[in-house]
C-alpha cells in the first residue's frame, strides 16, 4: 500500500512530468508548424512574440486570481484543461491571424502552469509538521527538465512518421494527463502570494534602478539571455532547411537542455565560485558569440552538436551569475521586486521584443541573421568586464 506522502509524490511527478513533457513536445517545434502553414518568417516572429507578451500578462493576472480565491489547485487544473483544449485549435487553423489568435489564447492558458505548480510544490517541500518535507523541490524540477528533453526527442521522432501536426496531439494528451493531478496534492503555500504593488514597493523599484550593479545585471540578462530569441524561434527552421530531420533536430536541442541541467545541478556554482561573476559573465558572453557565429555560418551536424551544449554557459551559468549579483547588491526586503524586474524586463520583455525583430532579420538574411545575436553577446563583453570593479551598493 502506498503511503500518503508517496501518493503525493507520485502525483507531483505525474504533474511535472506531464507538464514539462507537454512543453517539450510542442514549443521547440511550433515554428516549424507555423512555417508548414506558409507563414513568412516575419509573421512567425510576430506570432511568437505575441504569445510571449500574453504569457507575461496572463501569468501575473492568474496568479493574483488564484491568491484572491485561495484556490491555486483548482485554477491550475482549469488552466491545464483549457490549454489542452485550446491547443487543439492549431489543427484546423489556417492563415496568419487565426494562427496568431490560437497561439495567444494558448499562451494565456499555458502561462500560469509553471508558477502555480511551483507554488504547490514549494509548499509541499516546506516542513510538514514532524514528518518533514513531502517532496524535494529541486529534484522535482530536475525531473521536469528531464521530461522536457524526453518529450523533445520523442516528438522529433514521431514527426518523421506522422507529420508536424503530431505535436498538437501530443501536447494536448500530456496536458490532459496533468490536469487532474493538482486536485490530489496538498495546498501548503510556502509564501504569501502575489500581493498588489504598494507605494513602498514602487519606491523600491527606484532604489533598485539606482544600484549600478543591479542595472548592469539586468542589461547583461537582456543582451545574453535575449540573444537566445533567434535560436528559440528559428533554429528548428534553420536546421530543417539544411536537411536535418526533425528527429535529429530534437536530439540536438535536447543536448542544450542536458547541458543546462548539468550546469544548474553540478558544475555551475563551483565554476562561479572559482572565476567570480565577472569571469562567469564574460565566459557566458564569449560562448554566446561562438555559438551564434557557428549557427550563422554552418548547419554541419558535428558543428551544431558541438555548440548546442554551450547553452549551459549562455543560459544556465549567466542565470546563476545574475542571481549571485542580485544577492550581493540588493537589499533583502527588495529581493522579490528585484527578481520580478529581472524576470519580466531582463528576460521576458527583452526576449519578446527581440523575437519580434528576429522575424524580419531571418526573412532577409536567413541563417546569417544569427550574427545579430552574436553581436548582442559581443556587446555584453565590455559590460561583463566592468563587474571586476568594486561593487558599490553591495549590501
Residue ranges and their predicted role:
Residues 57-71, 159, 263-276, 362:
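Helix-to-loop junctions at the C-terminal end of transmembrane segments
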Amino acid at each position: 500500500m502506498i503511503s500518503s506522502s508517496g501518493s503525493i509524490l507520485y502525483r507531483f511527478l505525474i504533474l511535472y512530468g506531464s507538464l514539462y513533457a507537454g512543453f517539450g513536445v510542442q514549443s521547440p517545434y511550433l515554428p516549424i508548424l507555423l512555417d508548414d502553414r506558409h507563414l513568412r518568417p516575419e509573421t512567425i516572429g510576430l506570432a511568437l512574440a505575441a504569445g510571449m507578451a500574453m504569457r507575461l500578462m496572463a501569468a501575473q493576472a492568474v496568479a493574483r486570481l488564484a491568491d484572491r480565491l485561495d484556490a491555486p489547485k483548482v485554477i491550475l487544473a482549469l488552466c491545464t484543461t483549457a490549454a489542452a483544449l485550446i491547443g487543439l485549435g492549431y489543427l484546423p487553423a489556417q492563415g496568419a491571424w487565426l494562427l496568431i489568435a490560437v497561439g495567444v489564447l494558448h499562451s494565456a492558458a499555458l502561462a500560469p502552469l509553471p508558477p502555480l505548480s511551483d507554488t504547490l510544490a514549494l509548499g509541499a517541500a516546506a516542513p510538514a509538521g514532524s514528518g518533514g518535507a513531502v517532496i524535494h523541490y529541486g529534484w522535482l524540477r530536475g525531473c521536469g527538465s528531464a521530461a522536457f528533453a524526453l518529450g523533445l526527442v520523442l516528438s522529433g521522432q514521431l514527426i518523421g512518421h506522422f507529420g508536424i501536426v503530431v505535436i498538437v496531439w501530443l501536447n494536448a494528451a500530456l496536458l490532459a494527463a496533468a490536469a487532474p493531478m493538482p486536485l490530489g496534492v496538498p495546498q501548503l503555500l510556502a509564501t504569501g502570494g502575489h500581493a498588489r504593488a504598494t507605494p513602498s514597493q514602487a519606491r523600491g523599484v527606484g532604489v533598485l534602478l539606482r544600484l549600478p550593479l543591479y542595472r548592469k545585471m539586468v542589461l547583461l540578462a537582456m543582451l545574453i539571455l535575449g540573444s537566445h530569441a533567434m535560436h528559440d524561434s528559428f533554429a528548428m527552421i534553420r536546421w530543417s532547411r539544411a536537411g536535418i530531420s526533425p528527429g535529429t533536430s530534437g536530439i540536438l536541442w535536447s543536448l542544450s537542455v542536458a547541458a543546462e541541467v548539468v550546469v544548474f545541478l553540478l558544475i555551475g556554482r563551483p565554476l562561479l565560485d572559482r572565476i567570480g561573476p565577472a569571469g562567469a559573465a564574460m565566459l557566458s558572453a564569449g560562448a554566446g558569440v561562438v555559438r551564434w557565429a557557428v549557427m550563422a555560418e554552418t548547419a554541419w551536424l558535428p558543428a551544431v552538436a558541438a555548440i548546442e551544449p554551450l547553452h549551459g554557459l549562455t543560459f544556465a551559468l549567466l542565470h546563476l551569475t545574475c542571481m549571485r549579483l542580485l544577492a550581493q547588491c540588493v537589499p533583502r526586503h527588495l529581493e522579490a521586486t528585484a527578481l520580478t524586474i529581472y524576470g519580466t524586463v531582463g528576460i521576458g520583455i527583452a526576449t519578446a521584443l527581440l523575437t519580434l525583430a528576429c522575424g524580419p532579420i531571418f526573412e532577409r538574411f536567413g541563417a546569417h541573421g544569427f550574427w545579430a545575436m552574436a553581436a548582442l553577446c559581443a556587446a555584453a563583453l565590455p559590460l561583463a568586464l566592468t563587474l571586476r570593479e568594486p561593487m558599490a551598493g553591495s549590501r
